[in-house]
């Protein structure tokens, strides 16, 4: 079977079975969330932009927000026959892309995104196997659904497996 590469855009998500790859680019302060069921060989990838939807009304794209995207991704995976108890997560991104003179948490969207993703994964009882968070460089996340492997390409730093 030919391996298909499926792009996941900003504020987007997708699912795939083995042996396909889900790829998202442009993870600066955004966070990529790869969820994988080893038993079924099925996974999903979400690219979130913001930590929390509660400050917004009339939400047109719930995948933009960590608190909404993770439960939606889990639901989509369950529709494909995944058992939520088998899901494991790998996450990347959450960089501080801009140097603000105000170092308050409100300005550090990358850190807030990372914290929100960890919180919602814990709430959904999905353990995090590995992470590549923080720093100040953009990342690309490549999720191989055949084994659940995630490679991170960081600007100026090469590729590593998490």
Swiss-Prot record:
Keywords, alphabetical: Chemotaxis, Hydrolase
UniProt catalytic activity: L-glutaminyl-[protein] + H2O = L-glutamyl-[protein] + NH4(+)
Signal sequence annotation: none
Coiled-coil intervals: none
Membrane-traversing stretches: none
One GO biological process term: chemotaxis
Function: Probably deamidates glutamine residues to glutamate on methyl-accepting chemotaxis receptors (MCPs), playing an important role in chemotaxis.
Entry protein name: Probable chemoreceptor glutamine deamidase CheD
């Amino acid at each position: 079977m030919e391996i298909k590469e499926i792009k996941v855009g900003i504020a987007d998500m997708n699912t795939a079975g083995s042996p396909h790859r889900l790829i998202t680019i442009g993870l600066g302060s955004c966070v990529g969330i790869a969820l994988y069921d080893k038993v079924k060989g099925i996974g999903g990838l979400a690219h979130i932009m913001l930590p929390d939807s509660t400050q917004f009304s009339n939400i047109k794209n719930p995948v933009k927000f960590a608190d909404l995207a993770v439960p939606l991704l889990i639901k989509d995976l369950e529709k494909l026959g995944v058992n939520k108890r088998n899901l494991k997560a790998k996450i990347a991104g959450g960089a501080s892309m801009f140097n603000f003179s105000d170092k308050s948490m409100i300005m550090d969207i990358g850190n807030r995104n990372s914290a929100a993703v960890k919180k919602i994964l814990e709430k959904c009882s999905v353990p995090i196997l590995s992470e590549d968070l923080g720093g100040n460089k953009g990342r690309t996340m490549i999720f191989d659904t055949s084994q659940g492997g995630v490679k991170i390409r960081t600007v100026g730093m090469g590729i590593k497996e998490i």
